[in-house]
Amino acid sequence: DKPTTKPICEQAFGNSGPCFAYIKLYSYNQKTKKCEEFIYGGCQGNDNRFITLAECEQKCIK
């Protein structure tokens, strides 16, 4: 059995990962029910990250 991963929009908001790049991306925040900007470090993190606000909203806001 494969471990089930949470749907992208339910994964932790704004997971920057351990690296030190400075990439502005968007992530869905379950607490505010909005897509918000965060800084991504460039490696690891999770799948709750989108290049544009529109892409985030299209995937996560019903």
Swiss-Prot record:
Ranked from the top, the taxonomy reads: Eukaryota, Metazoa, Ecdysozoa, Arthropoda, Hexapoda
Q: What does this protein do?
A: Inhibits chymotrypsin and thus avoids the accidental chymotrypsin-mediated activation of prophenoloxidase. This enzyme is required by the insect immune system to produce melanin which is used to engulf foreign objects.
Keyword presence, Oxidoreductase: no
List the cysteine pairs that form cystine: 9-60, 19-43, 35-56
Q: Which residues form the BPTI/Kunitz inhibitor domain?
A: 9-60
Q: Fetch the InterPro entries from UniProt.
A: Kunitz_BPTI (IPR002223), Kunitz_BPTI_sf (IPR036880), Prtase_inh_Kunz-CS (IPR020901), TFPI/VKTCI-like (IPR050098)
Note the PROSITE patterns from the entry: BPTI_KUNITZ_1 (PS00280), BPTI_KUNITZ_2 (PS50279)
Residues annotated as site: Reactive bond:
20-21
Q: Give the protein name, as stated in the record.
A: Chymotrypsin inhibitor SCI-I
Among PANTHER family, the record links this protein to: KUNITZ-TYPE PROTEASE INHIBITOR-RELATED, SERINE PEPTIDASE INHIBITOR, KUNITZ TYPE, 2
Keyword entries, A-Z:
Disulfide bond, Protease inhibitor, Serine protease inhibitor
Recorded hits in Gene3D superfamilies, A to Z, give: Pancreatic trypsin inhibitor Kunitz domain
Which Gene Ontology molecular-function terms are recorded? serine-type endopeptidase inhibitor activity
- SMART domains attached here? KU (SM00131)
Disulfide bond as UniProt keyword: yes
A single Pfam family, by name?
Kunitz_BPTI
Q: Which organism is it from?
A: Bombyx mori (Silk moth)
Q: Give a Gene Ontology cellular component term annotated to this protein.
A: extracellular space
Matches recorded under SUPFAM superfamilies: BPTI-like (SSF57362)
